[in-house]
Amino acid sequence: MTAFRTVYPDIIGAYEKIRFSTKNLPESQFLYGEQAPEPLLVTENGVQFATYLNEGLMTGIFLDQKEVRGRLVDGFAVGKTVLNMFSYTGAFSVAAAMGGAVATTSVDLAKRSLPKTTEQFEVNHLNLAPQKIIVMDVFDYFKYASRKGLSYDMIILDPPSFARNKKKVFSVAKNYGELVKDSIDILTDKGTLIASTNAANLSLAKYKKMVITALQEKNVRYKITDTYQLPADFQVNPNFPEGNYLKVLFIEIEK
């Protein structure tokens, strides 16, 4: 810690995240300097996000997705209805709303997603009326939306690499194709799918193949218009390509 403080003397305050299993240490703890206010409001692409630096491993926003959120803020979602699956704190939804989306729907199984997402809209002074925040299993919501005849101009998929609940075990490597197929069922006839994963054990080539296979099985016309990986300020060791874990595809789909 002495060496860190010597190299980075301008750090106002520091928190530690414990990413290995331990019985004696918390996932997160304050180390030195000034403690951040809660929430700590950070600004990205002109959008404010409420973050909590000492709330477990996650802070409320994943900075590696800033370029994708920037596209949404810059008008990619203007005039569109947006469905944000595995929405966490709703960062994609807020970015889309700030960029002119007419309505957003955020779906996540975690109960905390409701107050967390509401807060993100509120700190940006956005009207909550056209923003739906739903606590539900994503696969159950696909069935619900299909049964109710709901459809969306844009669907964002950003699942965890692995997740488990009472009904299902999900892994990107085995189940991502299901997400793509279910999305197509409730996408408008000419819609956009933003497909994302942070699975480090899956190369970009294999990920693209997985997504394309699902699209072909649904017999739709599609075009991958943009591909994103980690932003330039996220260092990647060329000898460890798995470190460039983020993979995001922008796909235009016509049914």
What residue spans do the PLM features occupy?
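Conserved alpha-helix/loop element of class I SAM-dependent methyltransferases that forms part
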Residues: 63-80
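Non-catalytic substrate-recognition/targeting regions of SAM-dependent transferases
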Residues: 1-62, 70
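Conserved SAM-binding loop of SAM-dependent methyltransferases across substrates and taxa
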Residues: 89-101
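C-terminal catalytic and target-recognition region of SAM-dependent MTase-like enzymes
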Residues: 178, 192-255
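Conserved class I S-adenosyl-L-methionine
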Residues: 78-88
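S-adenosylmethionine
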Residues: 138-214
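Conserved SAM-binding motif I beta-strand of class I
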Residues: 103-108
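S-adenosyl-L-methionine
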Residues: 112-156
